[in-house]
Amino acid sequence: MDAAEKKKIIEEYATHPGDTGSPDVQVAILTKRIAELTEHLKVHKGDHHSRRGLMLMVGQRRRLLNYIAKNDIEHYRELIARLGLRR
């Protein structure tokens, strides 16, 4: 993911201008990185170092989503619908 893609994601999921660290933004960025790394691992099946990084990212996203769900369940449902998670 290059800087332009990251900036676009930040603008789309920011809760206010200048917001780069809210849980929504973090989850959106992690989702993009997870998708890219998943595609990489489909080609490079033996890349176990990257697989471990993927598992760490999935765990981090899960923790952030748990935090959002605990604080505002409706917001959580909207976010996972926007991201296309939990089909």
From Swiss-Prot:
TM ranges: none
Gene Ontology MF: a single term? structural constituent of ribosome
Q: Which UniProt keywords apply?
A: Ribonucleoprotein, Ribosomal protein, RNA-binding, rRNA-binding
* Native species: Cutibacterium acnes (strain DSM 16379 / KPA171202) (Propionibacterium acnes)
SMART domains assigned to the protein according to its UniProt record, in alphabetical order: Ribosomal_S15
- Could you name the Gene Ontology cellular component terms for this entry? cytosolic small ribosomal subunit
The family annotation for this protein states: Belongs to the universal ribosomal protein uS15 family.
Is the Iron keyword given for this protein? no
Could you give the subunit structure recorded for this chain? Part of the 30S ribosomal subunit. Forms a bridge to the 50S subunit in the 70S ribosome, contacting the 23S rRNA.
Q: Which GO terms describe its biological process?
A: translation
What does the function comment of this entry state?
A: One of the primary rRNA binding proteins, it binds directly to 16S rRNA where it helps nucleate assembly of the platform of the 30S subunit by binding and bridging several RNA helices of the 16S rRNA. Forms an intersubunit bridge (bridge B4) with the 23S rRNA of the 50S subunit in the ribosome.
The protein's matches in CDD domains, at most eight in alphabetical order, are given as:
Ribosomal_S15p_S13e
What's the protein called, per UniProt? Small ribosomal subunit protein uS15
